[in-house]
């Protein structure tokens, strides 16, 4: 913001001689109207030399989002690397441990392996098959006994975020167990 020069009065003018006097009619307090009387921040006003903060050198390529440009012919190298990392993670198998809640039938073998690229729907179908459920029976599944994931959630993503001892713990019940 540019500072305004202090008001000065000529011998023949009827203008006020100070900023405070000029602000009395405007309803401004002395603090609001006395900005011009404050010392400026240039180098010669106080005798203290101020050095500008140097800009950082950004020599690395900044990552771009796909929405950054309408005409984006290819993905930036960071996006290629991120996609390759995600594909590598979801190409393996993850361990799923089924944990029965009260009043649920117990499986003989509770630990199974499933492809990380599968949806959680596959886990529920597999569990229904192992429990010999009818089409009308309900099975409620909860990850870590905390939440019920959507059927379209990826098993690899759930395992990465909520694994316990490198296993995805899926608690199951025939009746709703958690609100």
UniProtKB/Swiss-Prot annotation:
Q: Which residues span the membrane?
A: none
Stretches of Polar residues bias are at 1-21, 29-44
From the record heading this protein, give the residue positions of the covalent cross-link Glycyl lysine isopeptide (Gly-Lys) (interchain with K-172 in ATG5): 179
Q: What is its main location?
A: membrane
Question: What InterPro entries does the database record attribute to this sequence?
Answer: Atg12, Ubiquitin-like_domsf
Q: What keyword terms does UniProt attach to this protein? A: Autophagy, Isopeptide bond, Membrane, Protein transport, Transport, Ubl conjugation pathway
Q: What does this protein do?
A: Ubiquitin-like protein involved in cytoplasm to vacuole transport (Cvt), autophagy vesicles formation, mitophagy, and nucleophagy. Conjugation with ATG5 through a ubiquitin-like conjugating system involving also ATG7 as an E1-like activating enzyme and ATG10 as an E2-like conjugating enzyme, is essential for its function. The ATG12-ATG5 conjugate functions as an E3-like enzyme which is required for lipidation of ATG8 and ATG8 association to the vesicle membranes.
Query: What do we know about how this protein assembles, alone or with others?
Result: Forms a conjugate with ATG5.
Q: What is this protein called?
A: Ubiquitin-like protein ATG12
Gene source species: Ajellomyces capsulatus (strain NAm1 / WU24)
Gene, per the UniProt record: ATG12
């Amino acid at each position: 913001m540019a500072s305004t020069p202090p008001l000065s009065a000529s011998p023949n003018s009827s203008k006020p001689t100070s900023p405070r006097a000029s602000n009395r009619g405007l309803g401004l307090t002395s603090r609001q109207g006395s900005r011009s009387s404050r010392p400026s921040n240039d180098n010669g006003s106080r005798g203290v030399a101020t050095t500008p903060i140097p800009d950082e050198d950004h020599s690395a390529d900044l990552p771009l989002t796909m929405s950054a440009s309408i005409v984006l012919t290819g993905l930036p190298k960071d996006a290629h690397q991120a996609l390759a990392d995600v594909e590598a993670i979801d190409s393996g198998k993850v361990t799923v441990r089924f944990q029965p809640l009260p009043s649920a039938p117990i499986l003989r073998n509770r630990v199974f392996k499933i492809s990380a690229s599968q949806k959680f729907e596959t886990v529920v179908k597999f569990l229904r098959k192992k429990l010999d459920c009818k089409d009308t029976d309900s099975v409620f599944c909860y990850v870590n006994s905390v939440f019920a994931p959507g059927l379209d959630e990826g098993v690899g993503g759930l395992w990465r975020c909520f694994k316990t001892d490198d296993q995805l713990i899926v608690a199951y019940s025939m009746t709703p167990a958690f609100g």
